[in-house]
Amino acid sequence: MIPLRSSVTTQGRNAAGARALWRAAGLKDGDFNKPIIAIANSYTQFVPGHVHLKDVGDIVAGAIREAGGVPREFNTIAVDDGIAMGHGGMLYSLPSREIISDSVEYMVNAHAADAIVCISNCDKITPGMLNAAMRLNIPAIFVSGGPMEAGKAVVVDGVAHTPTDLITAISASANDSVDDRGLSIVENSACPTCGSCSGMFTANSMNSLTEALGLSLPGNGSTLATHAARRALFENAGRTIVDMCQRYYNHDDDSVLPRNVANKHAFDNAMTLDMAMGGSTNTVLHILAAAQEGDIDFDLADIDRLSREVPCLSKVAPNSNYHMEDVHRAGGIPAILGELNRAGLLHDDVHAVHAQSLSDWLATWDIRTDNPTQIALDLFHAAPGGVRTTVPFSTDNKWDELDTDSENGCIRDVDHAYTADGGLVILRGNLAEDGAVIKAAGIDESLWHFSGPAHVLESQEDAVNAILNKQIKPGEVVVIRYEGPAGGPGMQEMLHPTAFLKGAGLGTQCALITDGRFSGGSSGISVGHISPEAAHGGLIGLIHDGDTVTIDVHKRQLTLDVPEDVLAERREKMNVSEHPWRPLNRQRRVSKALQAYASMATSADTGAVRKVNDRR
């Protein structure tokens, strides 16, 4: 039997002061022998993916209490990447991941909590809490707020937009053929409900990956925020975490700990899922960071290996008209895992917080088996309500039929894959000695080789101005540098540049490369995470306008076609300059908080984690 961590605050004479404070917070005598379970909520009125979470903590707490635990809720910050996009606010997005990780660790360890339920949803919140869970390694379960419904189809000036989402609105804003009235129509349709944005963007990608890691319940990644079926996920999470506490503390069963659930094979499976579903490139950053926090031997080489082995089985917005509600109708994440498992592409020796084995897991939740269970059929029939709302669990609509078409449906089998390679591809070459990432699922295969003259810009703001002022020409490779974790600092997302290129009709005529990153909503020939970044001496910092840059997805190469002696001369000149490896004439205020982050930030190939001297 393992003593409860909380016993240092609840047991013995020395804990009298702590017990007095616990009593003031509502605990009673009978609570001091029960596990104290932290609920890390991320409710905020700033973010549509979190605006509905205010009362969700009470649902989880009630289930914990009924199962025999003591729930204690606290909140973390949550940044909305879409609202922070396109201005200085985006500098704070990735650093907020570390703030969230640290705040969860601080609260849990300061109060000696025995376990944690992570109520997350949007872009940096799930990764931040995941890093904390791997770091703490106490019983943990994830349950997210769920995706929003897709926007309804609209027709603007005779052009159909079906269905709409956030990216539709951003692209339309840069399209001169869409007038203000038309833009208003798209804007008012794009984001109709609470929940994380409706495509396979970063939030939904990460919430889906927690399923594959085994740390959340089936349906976590795809059950709509507005559907009544999602309430059961919160209730079951509360009951499950108490059971996990009993198994660990009462029966010495350490299989429930995050590092044993999300082990090396689970990370392999999660990234295999990511490749198959065409997830956001941001998942590469976050999975690498989580592995480091948990001391899991998983790195960029593993991701490269998997990208060569795993086919792309699903294309979801922004790469098609499918959205998360369509993924759910097709069986959600268990259906994709089932297709991968039947093809022998998953490790079958993993378990989850809800299942002792992968076979048990899929036998219960994969609707594409010969005998799907009624519980799975009921869950995946959950359909959108079609009503603008910020109220969770407000619809009980059902699909008339499920999408089990493995040839042409939302989720395909391996024999009918979109591409033989995975949705994400790792590129290397003299421009990316430590790696770069491209979302191949978002590009027609005819564009997998692109070569053109560089158009160099020292910031995202300069790039946006150049695009909107029609300074970018077809055939060019737009280079946005000094936007890496240290150089930005904060590694901004380049959603606006990619969306504006698309809106200007250049989405397939230009490429964009950067040491920054991309939104899960980005599309087009977009290469990010170039490592080493410009601020760390990366070759991207030596590109001149007109230099030829070549992207070759088939060969997995990213190269700058400039003679070595010329590059050596440029590097020497840079090193002796007044401000080496800094952007020229960039107007940007960098706060002390961001400077502190930049001083510790590593490049993207290591997940942009902080480099901290070990003082143990």
Curated annotation (Swiss-Prot):
Transmembrane segments: none annotated. Pfam families: ILV_EDD_C, ILVD_EDD_N. This is Dihydroxy-acid dehydratase. Pathway: Amino-acid biosynthesis; L-isoleucine biosynthesis; L-isoleucine from 2-oxobutanoate: step 3/4; Amino-acid biosynthesis; L-valine biosynthesis; L-valine from pyruvate: step 3/4. Mg(2+) binds at D81, D123, K124, E493. Binds 1 [2Fe-2S] cluster per subunit. This cluster acts as a Lewis acid cofactor. Belongs to the IlvD/Edd family. GO terms for cellular component: cytosol. SUPFAM superfamilies: IlvD/EDD N-terminal domain-like (SSF143975), LeuD/IlvD-like (SSF52016). NCBIfam families: ilvD, PRK12448.1. PANTHER family: D-XYLONATE DEHYDRATASE (PTHR43661), D-XYLONATE DEHYDRATASE YAGF-RELATED (PTHR43661:SF3). It comes from Corynebacterium kroppenstedtii (strain DSM 44385 / JCM 11950 / CIP 105744 / CCUG 35717). It comes from the Bacteria.
